[in-house]
């Protein structure tokens, strides 16, 4: 293996963050990147090691990675992640935590490089085949993928594991062996340790053939993307919701393709055929007076005003009151709802000295809002403003004392309106 493949993959990238576990694959990747940096002095290279805490050897792996990076003069970031049982399984949860840490560590203009190779590609394809995936899932991994507002590069994807090992031995590289890689209770390990050796013994070029099939599936997906682009434009609103009316006249196959692409745009996991059918039957086609909801982990699909919404699951906060004693500073909201802030310039009056400030999520009685005649209950205002039901007890309401002043981004009450130019605005960073 030469540096040619790597150079081609990274031709336009000058700031690189390399995922570095210390194992064979990532050690070869980092070594290749160090050689690339030597040939291109304008390249900035960093490495990141994820400490999952799953192995008793995890601390020694950190020390190994620190030693390697110090020798190669590569700045190393070590991120420790905590894995809790979220129903995904340990492999999927570890991967999720790992890539979340990658995304948080990337600097502006930096790309992420990972060490997946041809054998990994074959395993990914077979796992997708086992799940009954369609062309999107069978496309497996690309050499370049969008990630966290930048790119995820897989420069070694055309190389075999055997080739990487030959390179490492030839150059005297040292790497760690994760004992969990020998546990064939994990699906990927089962394929690598037991299934693929048999397949390659019979058909030596099996991984390369699988990679070609994955490439063909990816090409079919790109063609479908082109053919369905106009449909997607018609169906997706500026808020990112999916309009149902255009879908009603589509064939089942076309509609399913649109649903998959919409969910992909919302960064949702790829749904199974059964999941798509449930979305359509239980949510899209629910009774007009229903408020259908389908849970997917910590996310939900809901329907409102003939549109599908992909949202984060948040418990209602109607009984919650959050005191805001120092209203000049931002206030953190409960349940991951973000922060609120009162900033100078706006149509809200400032609180009087004797008024306490708080955020609540319900308001009793009739409310008089700026720009409307007469009083209305909060429920009626939500309906008039087109606020979806699940946002009605999670939208921050600003109170001075017992007086409702404003709902973030929705309305201002007459009691809260500024009478001079010294007003403030309620800004909600959800």
Curated annotation (Swiss-Prot):
Annotated catalysed reactions: cytidine(34) in tRNA(Ile2) + L-lysine + ATP = lysidine(34) in tRNA(Ile2) + AMP + diphosphate + H(+)
GO molecular function, one term: ATP binding
Keyword ATP-binding: yes
Alphabetically ordered keywords of this record: ATP-binding, Cytoplasm, Ligase, Nucleotide-binding, tRNA processing
Class of enzymatic activity (EC top level): ligase
Binding site for ATP: 21-26
UniProt keyword Cytoplasm, yes or no: yes
One GO cellular component term: cytoplasm
GO biological process entries: tRNA modification
Name of one Pfam family that matches: ATP_bind_3
SMART domains: TilS_C
EC number: 6.3.4.19
Domain notes from UniProt: The N-terminal region contains the highly conserved SGGXDS motif, predicted to be a P-loop motif involved in ATP binding.
Entry-linked PANTHER family: TRNA(ILE)-LYSIDINE SYNTHASE-RELATED (PTHR43033:SF1)
Protein name: tRNA(Ile)-lysidine synthase
Gene field: tilS
